[in-house]
């Protein structure tokens, strides 16, 4: 009887020890999982903050352009070029591939606009004799990329109608309706030769004197943009 009691006691101790070991292992795993989850959440929060700061910096570039246009009766191609060059974006914001200005062109003004761009010799002595709005065709209005910086490597974007493609048009319409910056979903830029994804950030530029509260949908709208 005593032997049975001793064996039973040893068995209970073994079971208790095993149960305690399993519980400790589960507790340790839970702690590790909790710590890993906490570290992941911290890393995600830091990454989100960094992304927001970077997006704020991108938007700041466009806000600066908005103010530059607001302070001038008309910003020509040479002035736009000199302004963007002074920003030194390649050094400070290397994620920005191109900064541009898209001009709203009603159908009735299309031919006059094309003629004006082709004969613009402020940057190139020969002007832009082959300039055309792309894709071709008659549409009620166009939002045409008129200025690009740097122009080298972004020739394919020059003349693109942002309203001709659904994702770009949606971002432009949201920007006009809100008066705030709007971004596209990831897209492949027309100047890309591969499948690299980027996104387009647009900020509206209204004609001088327009009421942003009452005339957003009816006023003449241009747009500054950055490809990122």
What are these regions (language model features)?
Residues 1, 225-228:
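Residue positions that mark polypeptide boundaries
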Residues 3-30:
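Extreme N-terminal signal-anchor transmembrane helix of membrane signaling/transducer proteins, especially
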Residues 14-24, 52-58, 154-158:
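Short low-complexity stretches enriched in small and charged residues
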Residues 27-60, 66, 70, 74, ...:
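Juxtamembrane membrane-water interface segments immediately C-terminal to a transmembrane helix
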Residues 37-45, 70-226:
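Intrinsically disordered, low-complexity polar/acidic regions
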């Amino acid at each position: 009887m005593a032997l049975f009691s001793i064996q039973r006691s040893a068995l209970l101790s073994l079971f208790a020890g095993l149960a305690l070991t399993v519980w400790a292992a589960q507790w340790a795993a839970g702690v590790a999982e909790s710590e890993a989850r906490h570290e992941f959440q911290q890393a995600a929060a830091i990454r989100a903050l960094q992304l927001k700061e970077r997006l704020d910096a991108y938007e700041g570039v466009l806000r600066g352009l908005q103010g530059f246009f607001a302070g001038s009766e008309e910003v020509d191609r040479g002035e736009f070029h000199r302004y963007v060059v002074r920003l030194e974006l390649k050094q400070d914001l290397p994620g920005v591939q191109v900064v541009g200005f898209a001009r709203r062109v009603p159908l009735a003004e299309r031919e006059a606009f094309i003629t004006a761009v082709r004969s613009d010799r402020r940057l190139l002595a020969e002007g832009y004799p082959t300039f055309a709005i792309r894709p071709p065709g008659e549409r009620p209005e166009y939002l045409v990329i008129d200025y690009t910086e740097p122009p080298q490597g972004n020739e394919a974007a020059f003349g693109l109608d942002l309203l001709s493609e659904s994702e770009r048009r949606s971002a432009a319409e949201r920007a006009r309706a809100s008066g705030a910056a709007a971004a596209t979903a990831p897209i492949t830029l027309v100047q890309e030769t591969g499948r690299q994804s980027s996104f387009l950030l647009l900020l509206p530029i209204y004609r001088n004197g327009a009421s942003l509260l009452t005339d957003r949908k009816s006023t003449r709208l241009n747009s500054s943009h950055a490809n990122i």
